[in-house]
């Protein structure tokens, strides 16, 4: 019951009256990587990973630079047997095969790939009867986690909360989608070959990769940026 009051007070401070006293740990907040408050999304993710009992991530783009700062905490989760799920994508064929291979090294993490235009960025951490959710603009890239000015909203909820239920429902729908495949070594090799043959420097690939082993339903062409636009997009992530 005491924790109920913490969540209610936190919501009042965030959405009703900023002068209401509340525990900052239960208060919805905006994470921007601002140097003023010294709070980066990377530091928040490390904290949540370290204290969670399970986690679900839905992130379109994952780069080596985004995984590397999390290696230590992810290895700790593996040693502790903490289970997690990561749903990523082949959108714009941004993710490198090496990143997928790295994710496969964590046997405690179930990884699936949505083969289509999925651009979500959401992080869910469960700790007891309370979950922490972060939804916003940051993919798992170094700049998006540390120095880019991003907008990521963090909130906490009981499992019975409506907002959390909506987020989990969307995650489960994408997780079970016919456009989603289980990450495997065979899939990674197929994806690697696809990128080699389709990503021509002078003419960017206009189709998102879809494994030949999976029948894709309603997969349409997506607009791809040119080389200079791609470099600009990477700098923004």
Can you say where each PLM-predicted feature lies in the sequence?
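PLD/PLD-like phosphodiesterase catalytic module centered on the HKD motif
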Residues: 1-235
């Amino acid at each position: 019951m005491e924790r109920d009051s913490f969540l209610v007070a936190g919501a009042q401070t965030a959405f009703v009256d900023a002068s209401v006293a509340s525990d900052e740990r239960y208060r919805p907040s905006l994470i921007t990587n601002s140097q003023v408050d010294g709070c980066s999304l990377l530091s928040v993710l490390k904290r949540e990973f370290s204290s969670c009992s399970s986690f679900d991530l839905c992130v379109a783009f994952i780069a080596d630079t985004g995984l590397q700062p999390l290696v230590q905490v992810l290895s700790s989760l593996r040693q502790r047997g903490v289970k997690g799920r990561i749903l990523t994508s082949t959108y714009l064929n941004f993710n490198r095969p090496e990143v997928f291979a790295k994710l496969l090294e964590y046997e405690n993490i179930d990884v699936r790939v949505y083969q289509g235009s999925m651009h979500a960025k959401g992080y869910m951490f469960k700790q007891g009867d309370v979950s922490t959710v972060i939804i916003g603009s940051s993919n798992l890239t170094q700049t998006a986690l540390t120095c880019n000015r991003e907008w990521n909203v963090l909130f906490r909820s009981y499992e019975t909360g409506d907002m959390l239920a909506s987020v989990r429902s969307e995650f489960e729908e994408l997780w079970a989608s016919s456009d989603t495949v289980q990450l495997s070594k065979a899939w990674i090799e197929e994806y690697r070959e696809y990128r080699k043959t389709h990503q021509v420097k002078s003419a960017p690939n206009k189709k998102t990769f879809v494994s030949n082993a999976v029948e894709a339903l309603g997969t349409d062409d997506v607009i791809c940026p040119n080389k200079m636009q791609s470099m600009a997009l990477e700098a923004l992530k």
